[in-house]
Amino acid sequence: MSRHPFPRRLAAVVLGTTLVVAAAACGSGDDADAADGTVTLRFSYFTSEQNPIAQTWKQWMEEVTERSDGSIEFEQYWDGTLLGADEVVEGLVDGRADIAQVTPTFYPGRFALTAVNELPFGTNNVGAIASAMSTLVEEDEDLAEEWSSQDLVPLAWNVGGSSAIASNREIATAADFRGLKVRGLDRGSRALDANGANVIALAPTELYGSMDRGLIDAVYGVQFGALPSLKLEEISDYVVDASTGAQTASTLAMGQAAWDSLTDEQRAVIEEVSADAPSMYEAANRAAEEAACTAFAESGTELSVLAGAEVEKLRAAGQDVVVDGWLAEVEEAGHDGAAFRETYDAAVEAAAADFPDGDESGVARCLAKG
């Protein structure tokens, strides 16, 4: 059973599932299944199917089924009904799911190199980041080993857009973060912590209730277009883009055993569709941002972008703390973090040419519409 040499030109999105041979219509058992050649993959995703990432995965699955002439089908589980966000890696390896979105933020220390895209105050260009990660997981041996050593096959990358902080308190300056109870998980939230915020780790499914009951004042780490999928426009008085840059890169992945169980033809179809994933996600994300813009306008929520001088204050207090912590983690894993970051930055810069207008945030685009 050979290791998967990660697919050529993998894409920018994410999914999850458990490999099951589909039962034949006449139900005559294993012989009929083998003759039919159809597989049903259990797909798992830990939040709503209404957000732009989920919409991308739905389109991805439809395309895989169509292009495989029905030889690959999917049994879909949404809202964490099969695997929670922190259960995906083990669930893919032990076969509870065949394909699922792996979000490294939920696995501290296990994806140290991958977490380079969590370093704050970088680009908002999610397409460029996703494309760069697709390239690097093929070309960089250390990054590839980070995934293959855990029996995971990354297929398509997705990157959360620049975080729009939904809040019940106005945030107009860096000082406004002091004492603010903010939901946060990734390294960008640690920059807020360094500026005096009280960062609280909560799963997406806990956000509405926690904010509604006053357990938190604000939500960080959810892209602008996905906020309405959590109904946060109903309970947020303000949404501010703090210009911390794009968030965590996640990947649609399969366990190695499930991947090896597919035929060469089926794997080729998955690779082909994954190569189209960045454009799928770009379209879904822009549509979701437009819908979010409308939803927040209708709810009367005040949108803003933090002034550049205030962003610099956030950066001065938080960036070095976060970067130094990441470098130490990467060194502990046996890698040269500074060298890898240079490689990553160069890959993102090269990929940005294919996404020329990708650095403007969803909040900024919404405000520009007037």
Q: What is each of the regions a protein language model found here?
A:
Residues 2-8, 13-17, 21, 26-128, ...:
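N-terminal secretory/targeting leader peptides
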Residues 124-144:
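A gly/proline- and charged-residue-enriched helix-loop-helix capping module
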